[in-house]
């Protein structure tokens, strides 16, 4: 959420930042609503002040036995009692309109973010490792997995398209990957493990920016009785399935003031995530690349404004370390202004090399690390008490540390062997009971 005072102070800068994101200027429209809101608030406050003053004057007039003046003042107060609710309603309506308009506008990019329209304008930052050479043609994970327990047919019977059932060695391998990531972040990177609810309220979704703009991309759960309830009750009492643990973790500080000594607050969770993928029709229809349900390790940091940029670099390094220890080839890119997420000021994507994708392999996103400034904090009313005693908005950051399903794909395709088996990376073998190869079982 944007601060209308900042827009008022620098409308040209606000519009210029929106233009960098490919959006039209909004300051004139927002400031017109703000002017109407401020005028309505002033009129309401003046009416209240006049009513209070007139009420006092009535007592003075009666004391002075000035019946005519007392009568006139009483008539004035009666009129104010009639008009004040209308003035208060006008102020509330303008306030809600401004909040609604502000809530639909994305965060502003930092100055160092590269300008661009889409993913083709993203900038490569660095690369780790190199592509492996194979004595055979690498196969995609869905072909490898067909003999190892990757079952899309059963999943379709259970839930429809974009779901998968993993069995035997593959189920164990995915569990091992997630546990390895969680252990790394909690024992070496200083993150506190959280096991959050998977169902959250509307205001929680609003806090991190999923609502109102991306309502169609969410899965919603409702009690049976609400299916026959009026539409308004259905929307207010529903619960959303988290599209990422970022939603739950970040909102742990909503409507609160934490002490500066508690920051930075670093949180992590390994959870299922649920996405409707409303805009992904026809994309990545094969395999596990794009699923309605998937597992992810999420990293969230709550910081002061002065430390958020350094924390962003630290978070990226933590996510990268996962892939380094798995010895997976990857690259880091800085997203351009036209490809950033709604709540982000700046985003790094980590793309892992998948040798079985496309014609000869492809880089695919496995992690996205973003710094959001105070954008989410304003939506959540999340603040910290600084050393001077004044409450200020925190800065929030989030990143995948990493997507477990896509890490499984990368391991399967990178460590595939000619006989169709998968060599288990060294770092995962302790989580697999010492198993070194996942192979088809007789």
Curated annotation (Swiss-Prot):
GO terms for molecular function: ATP binding; serine-tRNA ligase activity. This is Serine--tRNA ligase. GO terms for cellular component: cytoplasm. It is found in: Cytoplasm. Keywords: Aminoacyl-tRNA synthetase, ATP-binding, Cytoplasm, Ligase, Nucleotide-binding, Protein biosynthesis. It catalyses: tRNA(Ser) + L-serine + ATP = L-seryl-tRNA(Ser) + AMP + diphosphate + H(+); tRNA(Sec) + L-serine + ATP = L-seryl-tRNA(Sec) + AMP + diphosphate + H(+). It is an enzyme of class 6 (ligase). Belongs to the class-II aminoacyl-tRNA synthetase family. Type-1 seryl-tRNA synthetase subfamily. ATP binds at residues 275-277, 365-368. Disulfide bonds: none annotated. Pathway: Aminoacyl-tRNA biosynthesis; selenocysteinyl-tRNA(Sec) biosynthesis; L-seryl-tRNA(Sec) from L-serine and tRNA(Sec): step 1/1. L-serine binds at residues 244-246, 298, 400. Its EC number is 6.1.1.11. Its main location: cytoplasm. Homodimer. The tRNA molecule binds across the dimer. GO terms for biological process: selenocysteine biosynthetic process; seryl-tRNA aminoacylation. Consists of two distinct domains, a catalytic core and a N-terminal extension that is involved in tRNA binding. Catalyzes the attachment of serine to tRNA(Ser). Is also able to aminoacylate tRNA(Sec) with serine, to form the misacylated tRNA L-seryl-tRNA(Sec), which will be further converted into selenocysteinyl-tRNA(Sec). The gene is serS. InterPro entries: aa-tRNA-synt_IIb, aa-tRNA-synth_II, aa-tRNA-synth_II/BPL/LPL, Ser-tRNA-ligase_type_1, Ser-tRNA-synth_1_N, SerRS_1_N_sf, SerRS_core, tRNA-bd_arm. Pfam families: Seryl_tRNA_N (PF02403), tRNA-synt_2b (PF00587). HAMAP family: Ser_tRNA_synth_type1. SUPFAM superfamilies: Class II aaRS and biotin synthetases, tRNA-binding arm.
